[in-house]
């Protein structure tokens, strides 16, 4: 009987390969259908479908499978890869980029068939683009889940942080009590030193205490697991890009040249997925590759086409960009570097 690790590995690999191959086949079939309307025969349709199948087969045999085998067999090489994920690189470059390109090509083919953009449908089908993003998110979740067992319980991120912080505070208070009880002279000698130090830090005001439940029902409802949070965090992280690609299906966008910047900036935003979740550069790259470009793109869309993109999204991009610049760089300047003494 196969062990749990082998079953987990096989299931994960099958899901990743499906997420790697299916979006390209679906987008290319849509392109073949749009191209068939210009010709009465189905030769071109099956030719395009055959080329898409051949592309997926060649890329899988020459790139996907060899890279997967090397990563599985040569663990010492895998440990040398720091800060980025090869599997996501293959998905973004070999699946997402061709899919976005042929999504634009589908629109251009339909324009050529009808002679103008006015005869196009009111909205583009949402399934192909949603399938591309869903496949990327699924691969991202699988890569994060590999380090966790699928059975048993795992604490959430915030629970671990709370435990670590509490232990550090208890250790610090205990050390101070032991030092003052064991050697009063040293404690008195340490007072001038403490007073002579500049007041560069103040006690951090603790937030409201979290409740602890005695009821079994409430305790059950308050359960948190890091593996379940992975799904939530992964989908929330790319919600802004999903909304931007939804705008691309609006008739005022895909019937005009605005379709190109929307797809280009959305793809640039998705490039962040190739980095590891704890990469120190991820926050700054999120500003440079998503929030800051989306500010100008959303503002331009609103000024040119009206509120086809939510104003809330624009406010989110502006506030995230300003807060990142202020708290990471402006607060280091001399006028803003003084510590606050008021807890409110």
Swiss-Prot record:
Where is the protein localized? Membrane
Keyword field: Glycoprotein, Membrane, Transmembrane, Transmembrane helix
- Membrane topology summary: Multi-pass membrane protein
Which residues are noted as glycosylation sites? 114
Q: Which InterPro entries does the annotation name?
A: Uncharacterised_FAM23-like_TM (IPR020394)
Superkingdom: Eukaryota
Recorded GO cellular component terms are: membrane
According to the record, the segments passing through the membrane are 9-29, 47-67, 86-106, 122-142, 257-277, 294-314
Family label: Belongs to the TMEM236 family.
What protein name does the entry list?
Transmembrane protein 236
């Amino acid at each position: 009987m196969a062990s749990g690790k082998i079953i987990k590995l096989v299931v994960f690999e099958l899901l990743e390969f499906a997420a790697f191959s299916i979006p390209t086949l679906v987008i290319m079939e849509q392109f073949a259908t749009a191209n068939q309307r210009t010709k009465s025969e189905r030769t071109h349709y099956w030719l395009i479908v055959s080329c898409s199948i051949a592309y997926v087969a060649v890329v899988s045999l020459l790139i996907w499978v060899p890279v997967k085998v090397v990563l599985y067999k040569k663990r010492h090489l895998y440990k040398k890869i720091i800060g980025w994920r090869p599997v996501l690189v293959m998905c973004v470059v070999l699946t997402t980029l061709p899919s976005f390109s042929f999504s634009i090509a589908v629109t251009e083919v339909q324009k050529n068939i009808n002679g103008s953009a006015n005869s196009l449908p009111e909205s583009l089908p949402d399934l192909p683009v949603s399938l591309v993003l869903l496949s990327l998110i699924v691969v991202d979740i699988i890569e994060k889940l590999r380090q966790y067992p699928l059975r048993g319980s795992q604490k959430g991120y915030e629970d671990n942080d709370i435990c670590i912080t509490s232990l550090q505070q208890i250790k610090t208070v205990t050390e101070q009590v032991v030092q003052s009880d064991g050697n009063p002279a040293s404690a008195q000698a340490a007072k001038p030193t403490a007073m002579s130090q500049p007041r560069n830090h103040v006690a951090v005001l603790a937030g409201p205490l979290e409740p602890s439940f005695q009821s079994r029902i409430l305790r059950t409802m308050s359960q948190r697991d890091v593996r379940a949070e992975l799904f939530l965090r992964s989908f929330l992280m790319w919600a802004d890009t999903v909304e931007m690609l939804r705008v691309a299906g609006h008739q005022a966008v895909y019937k005009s040249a605005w379709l190109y910047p929307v797809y280009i900036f959305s793809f640039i935003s998705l490039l962040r997925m190739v980095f590891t979740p704890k990469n120190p550069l991820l926050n700054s790259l999120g500003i440079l590759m998503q929030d800051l470009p989306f500010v100008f793109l959303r503002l331009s869309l609103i000024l040119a086409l009206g509120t086809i993109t939510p104003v809330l999204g624009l406010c989110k991009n502006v506030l995230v960009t300003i807060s990142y610049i202020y708290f990471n760089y402006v607060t280091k300047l001399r006028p803003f570097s003084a510590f606050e003494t008021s807890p409110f």
